[in-house]
């Protein structure tokens, strides 16, 4: 993996600086209430504080369900398109732990100073164990013996924490969007966190005594705090029927929507999720082509998977 110096927030700061350098404006804490549409064309948005922002185009990087089912009047959309968007699969399957540590963990399987501490570590013993963890998700539970993908980025970038302290990031599978069909509770969240911490303790005795703080994000937090429907970090399941020309839905796979000048550029579009920026970059290429002002610094969207 590549590491951003200063943490993943540095990526956001760099993108913000680039936009501002080009004359753009960033407004944080400004949720959108609805997309304004007149005569089949998008011409702006209404923010949740009532402000209107108008423009020649509206470009949404929200997931396809949130964009069209929550913020666009259904009457403005073709019925078949609405049906396909409603059928788009977007079940979340993962959770996240961000852990502040008083000191680096000591894994019994790794010698002191092992270079593997600087890499990506997986907590799993076999394919069968991963399958059992997935079975829990299918039954509507978080995994009792999860598959954890763990990194300690401060091993590479110590500027992220005070001297001697560390930060651990745990990507955890599996966690369903609902627990046996009901919403997550705080007790569920805390139980999920304990399960993850207990598992790490088995591989690194004494680990839990070094924990200073834990931020837990189940699919509930990912939806409520980050805006990811059902907590799906890829804005839609990456199944064969939802890839390539079928992403997000057949007939609208080139970042355009049925509403003129309403574009989609998030991970619900091709090629899907991950920290790569390809959906946004491809959407930008298509928008420039639509404007008949292609950038000499950007190849056609189809050239980028």
Language-model segments: what does each one mean?
Residues 1-49, 56:
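Helical element adjacent to the flavin cofactor pocket in flavoenzyme catalytic cores
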Residues 33-161:
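Mid-domain catalytic core of redox enzymes
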Residues 65-70, 100-102, 122-123, 162-199:
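Conserved FAD/dinucleotide-binding core of flavoprotein oxidoreductases
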């Amino acid at each position: 993996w590549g590491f951003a110096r200063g943490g993943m927030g540095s990526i956001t700061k760099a993108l913000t600086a680039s936009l501002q350098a080009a004359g753009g404006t960033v407004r944080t804490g400004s949720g959108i209430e609805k997309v304004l549409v007149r005569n089949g064309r998008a011409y702006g948005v209404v923010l949740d504080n009532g402000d209107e922002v108008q423009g020649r185009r509206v470009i949404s990087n929200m997931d396809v369900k949130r964009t069209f089912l929550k913020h666009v009047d259904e009457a403005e959309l073709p019925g078949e398109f609405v049906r396909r968007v409603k059928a788009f699969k977007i079940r979340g399957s993962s959770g996240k732990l961000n852990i502040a540590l008083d000191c680096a963990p000591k894994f019994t399987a790794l010698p002191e100073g092992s270079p593997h501490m600087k890499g990506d570590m997986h907590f799993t013993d076999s394919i069968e164990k991963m399958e059992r963890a997935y079975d829990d998700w299918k039954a509507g539970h978080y995994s009792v013996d999860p598959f954890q993908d763990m990194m300690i980025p401060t091993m590479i970038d110590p500027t992220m924490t005070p001297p001697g302290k560390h930060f651990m990031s745990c990507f955890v599978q599996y966690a369903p969007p609902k627990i046996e069909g009901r919403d997550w509770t705080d007790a569920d969240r805390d139980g999920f966190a304990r399960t993850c911490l207990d598992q790490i303790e088995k591989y690194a005795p004494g680990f839990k005594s070094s924990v200073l703080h834990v931020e837990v994000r189940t699919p509930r937090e990912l939806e409520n705090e980050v805006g990811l429907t059902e907590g799906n970090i890829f804005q839609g399941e990456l199944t064969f029927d939802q890839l390539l020309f079928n992403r997000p839905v057949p007939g609208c796979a080139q970042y355009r929507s049925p509403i003129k000048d309403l574009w989609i550029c998030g991970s619900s579009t091709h090629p899907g999720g991950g920290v790569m920026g390809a959906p946004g970059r491809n959407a930008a290429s298509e928008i420039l082509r639509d404007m008949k002002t292609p950038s000499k610094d950007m190849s056609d969207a189809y050239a980028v998977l």
